[in-house]
Curated annotation (Swiss-Prot):
Designated name of the protein: Guanine nucleotide-binding protein G(i) subunit alpha
CC annotations in GO: cytoplasm; heterotrimeric G-protein complex
CDD domains (alphabetical): G-alpha
Domain G-alpha: 32-354
Organism from which the protein derives: Planorbella trivolvis (Marsh rams-horn)
Transmembrane segments: none
Lipidation (S-palmitoyl cysteine): C3
Family as reported in the entry's similarity comment: Belongs to the G-alpha family. G(i/o/t/z) subfamily.
Length: 354
C-alpha cells in the first residue's frame, strides 16, 4: 500500500515538474514575442523606421524592390517643386531670372501630363534650372511658412542622378520617400532571439481612430517626435503647431490607463534637420518661455525635458529617450540595439524570469 502511494506521489511530483517546465517554456516563449507599436504625429518618421528594420534585420531592398520606388521618387521631387513655386506666389517672391516665370508655366504643364514612373529630360532640365534660381532658393529657405516635404532638398539636389536613363533608386532614396500611411502596416523580423511584430499606424488625425484595436498585449510603444517641426504647423490644421500636437498626443499615450505597464520609448527624431534649423529659427517660436541658447545641445535637452515632464507617473514609469535620425541606418541600428536590451530586461521581469 505504502509502495503504491509512493509511486503516486512520485507521479504527482513528476507531473508538477512537467507543468512547471511547460509554464516556464511558455513564459520564455512569451518573453521572446515582442509587439511594438509605432506612434507619433503625421510625418514624424515612423514609416522610415519600418524601412530601416527591413534594411537592418532582413535582407534590405532588392534591385526589383528599389525599382518599384521610381514613381514615388519622381512624384516626391515634382510635388516638392510644385509646392515651392506655388508658395512663391503666396509669399510674393519673384524669380531671379526673367525666363524662369515662363519655364515655371511649362513645368506645371509637363508635370500635369508626366507618365507615372518616368521623368523626361525636358521636365528634369526645367526643374534643374528652376531649382538653381535665386528666387526659388529664397522661397525654399522660407519653407517653414508653407508645407514642404523634408526630402525636397535631397531629391532636387539629385535631379541629374534620378533623371538619368536606367536610374535605380538607392536604399537612401527609398528611405527618403514620403507616402502617407493609411491604415496599419505590420512588419515581422527576428533580432537577438526575439520575434518582433512592429505596427506602423497612420499619424494624421483622421487615422488615429484606427489605432485602438492594436493596443492589446503591446510590449512597448515607440513614440516618434520630429524635433525639426517645432516651428511648423500641421498640414491638416494650419493653426496648430506640430510640436504642440505631438506633446498633446504623447500626453494621451503616456498617461493612458491601458499603458500603465507598457514600456514607452521616445525617439526624438530628425535631429540632423533640427541641428541645422536651430541656428536660424529660435525655439521660442514653439516655447516662448525658453531662455536657453539656440544651440543643438541646449535646445534638444529642453525639448526632451518637455516630453518627459508630461509623464505623470515618474516614480513607477520610466521614459526611455533617444535622439535619432531615421534616415541614418547606423544611428537607427545603434539605438534599436539599446531599445532591444531594455525590452529583453522588461520582458523577463514581466514573465518572472529576471
Amino acid at each position: 500500500m505504502g509502495c503504491v502511494t509512493s509511486q503516486e506521489d512520485k507521479a504527482a511530483v513528476e507531473r508538477s515538474k512537467q507543468i512547471d517546465k511547460s509554464l516556464r517554456m511558455d513564459g520564455e516563449k512569451a518573453a521572446r514575442e515582442v509587439k511594438l507599436l509605432l506612434l507619433g504625429a503625421g510625418e514624424s518618421g515612423k514609416s522610415t523606421i519600418v524601412k530601416q528594420m527591413k534594411i537592418i534585420h532582413e535582407k534590405g531592398y532588392s534591385q526589383e524592390e528599389c525599382l518599384q520606388y521610381n514613381p514615388v521618387v519622381y512624384s516626391n521631387a515634382i510635388q516638392s517643386m510644385i509646392a515651392i513655386i506655388k508658395a512663391m506666389g503666396q509669399l510674393k517672391i519673384q524669380f531671379g531670372h526673367p525666363d524662369r516665370a515662363e519655364e515655371a508655366r511649362q513645368f506645371f504643364a509637363l508635370a500635369g501630363h508626366a507618365d507615372e514612373g518616368e521623368m523626361s529630360q525636358e521636365l528634369s532640365g526645367i526643374m534643374k534650372r528652376l531649382w538653381k534660381d535665386v528666387g526659388v532658393q529664397e522661397c525654399f529657405s522660407r519653407s517653414r511658412e508653407y508645407q514642404l516635404n523634408d526630402s525636397a532638398e535631397y531629391y532636387l539636389n539629385a535631379l541629374d542622378r534620378i533623371s538619368a536613363p536606367g536610374y535605380i533608386p538607392t536604399e537612401q532614396d527609398v528611405l527618403r520617400t514620403r507616402v502617407k500611411t493609411t491604415g496599419i502596416v505590420e512588419t515581422h523580423f527576428t533580432f537577438k532571439d526575439l520575434h518582433f511584430k512592429m505596427f506602423d499606424v497612420g499619424g494624421q488625425r483622421s487615422e488615429r481612430k484606427k489605432w485602438i484595436h492594436c493596443f492589446e498585449g503591446v510590449t512597448a510603444i515607440i513614440f516618434i517626435v520630429a524635433m525639426s517641426e517645432y516651428d511648423l504647423t500641421l498640414a491638416e490644421d494650419q493653426e496648430m503647431n506640430r510640436m504642440m500636437e505631438s506633446m498633446k498626443l504623447f500626453d494621451s499615450i503616456c498617461n493612458n490607463k491601458w499603458f500603465t505597464e507598457t514600456s514607452i520609448i521616445l525617439f526624438l527624431n530628425k535631429k540632423d534637420l533640427f541641428e541645422e534649423k536651430i541656428k536660424k529659427s529660435p525655439l521660442t517660436i514653439c516655447f516662448p518661455e525658453y531662455t536657453g541658447a539656440n544651440t543643438y545641445e541646449e535646445a534638444a535637452a529642453y525639448i526632451q525635458l518637455q516630453f518627459e515632464n508630461l509623464n505623470k507617473k515618474k516614480d513607477t514609469k520610466e521614459i526611455y529617450s533617444h535622439f535619432t535620425c531615421a534616415t541614418d541606418t547606423n544611428n537607427v541600428q545603434f539605438v534599436f540595439d539599446a531599445v532591444t536590451d531594455v525590452i529583453i530586461k522588461n520582458n523577463l521581469k514581466d514573465c518572472g524570469l529576471f
